């Protein structure tokens, strides 16, 4: 019998959580015999909404209308799947599942732990998020009873990574780059993505060379005002370095790009490598997309991106240019009440190491150095495409929603009891 499942999330927004909500939706739709899907769309900050007219978008619109009518008639749900940050989780159905990107720092907020504990289970996008949620513990004293209070995670937390995306035809981009070698970085402007340091390290290392850095970014939306603000911010970083007679170039790439256009960017003949030194990632989707598209990656080996930048063997084997880093406190201006708490830390890429790894990647590509990460990037892309296939990730996600493993364990226990009786 089909389960009525309500998906709550920013499914129509161009955001990380929007991408996450659409992955959840596609996973549920891959098993039409198991679920009757309903959708409650959320906004996500000031991010833009999807504007493409696709069969999926039309189906989402129809399902939202169906959901409104169903709720107005008093309809109930067997399962709610809530794609958002944990402090927004609610009791909406007989069974409630939280699906969150988790945390990009060393500690989860106590509000998050408390909210996760109200869920029947929680799904996260990376082992980093799982580990932080499970290891964050708090204690205090009850103001009324003076008794010590302990708070830690008590709910089941499981990981499902994102799948690779494949396209039959990718558009040709007219990037108009006049530098011979080009790095790419894809990052929203803000403290966490560490974009200013990325630009600074690039210019200081390649200031007198014919090398470019393509910066795909925005602040929140894809408007002209947003573009002008991004342009001014980048110019401010460049001007602060006081580099005269600079030959290297920084290109601003701004505006709405479809999935096909983004993947065309990763494989464009003018793009040679991906550089990303964020302070922390729940998963690091642009880094993942670049890696499975065959781009060499320069990054830090901490937080969500570790799930695909390293092998799962022990000890983990890196498949990227590792930038050294230090874990230090999150600055005051990046704290977010109920989300990023004061005692948390995140990674700070060492600037000299960033320059060294960018240089090493540059040299490996220019000199065709054997056994380098750069020359093995396409081989690694093939491995990722197999390990993170759409079919596997959809299946893993559906199994967690349906408690397939728990059901299998019960069935095995019943079979064991029957065998004992016989």
State where each predicted segment sits:
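N-terminal pre-catalytic "stem/leader" segment of glycosyltransferase-like enzymes
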Residues: 1-76, 212, 395, 422
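Conserved donor-binding/catalytic core segment of Leloir-type glycosyltransferases
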Residues: 6-9, 176-193, 199-202, 213-215
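Extended catalytic core of nucleotide-activated donor transferases of GT-like folds
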Residues: 6-8, 46-132
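Donor nucleotide-sugar binding/catalytic pocket of nucleotide-sugar-dependent glycosyltransferases
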Residues: 121-169
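Nucleotide-activated donor-binding/catalytic signature segment of Leloir-type glycosyltransferases, i.e.
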Residues: 224-265, 272-273
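A charged, aromatic-enriched C-terminal amphipathic alpha-helix characteristic of glycosyltransferases
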Residues: 345-356, 366-399
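C-terminal alpha-helical cap of glycosyltransferases
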Residues: 359-367, 390-422
């Amino acid at each position: 019998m089909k389960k009525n499942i309500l998906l709550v999330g920013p499914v129509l927004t161009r955001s990380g959580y929007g991408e996450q909500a659409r992955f959840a939706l596609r996973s549920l739709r891959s098993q039409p015999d198991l679920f009757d899907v309903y959708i409650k769309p959320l906004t996500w900050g000031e991010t833009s909404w999807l504007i493409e007219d696709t069969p999926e978008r039309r189906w989402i619109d129809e399902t939202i209308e169906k959901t409104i009518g169903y709720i107005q008639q008093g309809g109930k749900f067997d399962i709610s799947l809530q794609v958002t940050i944990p402090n927004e989780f609610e009791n909406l159905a007989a069974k409630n599942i939280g699906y969150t990107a988790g945390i990009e720092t060393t500690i989860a907020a106590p509000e998050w732990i408390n909210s996760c504990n109200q869920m029947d289970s929680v799904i996260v996008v990376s082992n980093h998020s799982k580990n932080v949620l499970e290891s964050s513990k708090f204690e205090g004293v009850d103001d009324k009873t003076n008794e010590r209070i302990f708070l830690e995670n008590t709910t089941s937390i499981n990981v499902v990574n994102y799948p690779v995306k494949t396209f039959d035809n990718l558009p040709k981009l007219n990037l108009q780059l006049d530098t011979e070698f080009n790095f790419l970085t894809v990052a929203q402007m803000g403290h966490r993505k560490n974009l200013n340091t990325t630009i600074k390290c690039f210019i200081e290392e390649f200031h007198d060379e014919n090398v470019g850095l393509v910066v795909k970014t925005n602040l929140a939306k894809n408007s002209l005002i947003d573009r002008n603000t991004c342009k001014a911010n980048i110019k401010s970083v460049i001007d602060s370095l006081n580099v005269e007679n600079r030959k290297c170039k920084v290109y601003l790439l701004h505006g709405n790009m479809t999935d096909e256009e983004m993947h065309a960017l990763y494989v464009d003949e003018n793009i040679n490598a991906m550089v990303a030194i964020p302070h922390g990632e729940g998963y690091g989707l642009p880094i993942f997309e670049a890696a499975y598209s065959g781009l060499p990656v320069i990054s830090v080996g901490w937080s969500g991106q570790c799930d695909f930048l390293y092998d799962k063997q022990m000890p983990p084997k890196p498949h990227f240019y590792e930038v050294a880093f230090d874990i230090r406190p999150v600055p005051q201006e990046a704290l977010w009440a109920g989300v990023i708490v004061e005692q948390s830390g995140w990674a700070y890429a060492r600037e000299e190491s960033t320059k060294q790894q960018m240089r090493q990647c540059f040299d490996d590509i220019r000199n065709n150095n054997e056994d380098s990460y750069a020359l093995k990037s396409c081989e690694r892309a093939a491995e990722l495409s197999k390990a993170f296939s759409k079919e596997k990730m959809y299946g893993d996600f559906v199994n967690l929603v349906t408690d397939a493993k728990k059901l299998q364990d019960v069935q095995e226990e019943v079979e064991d009891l029957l065998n004992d009786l016989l």
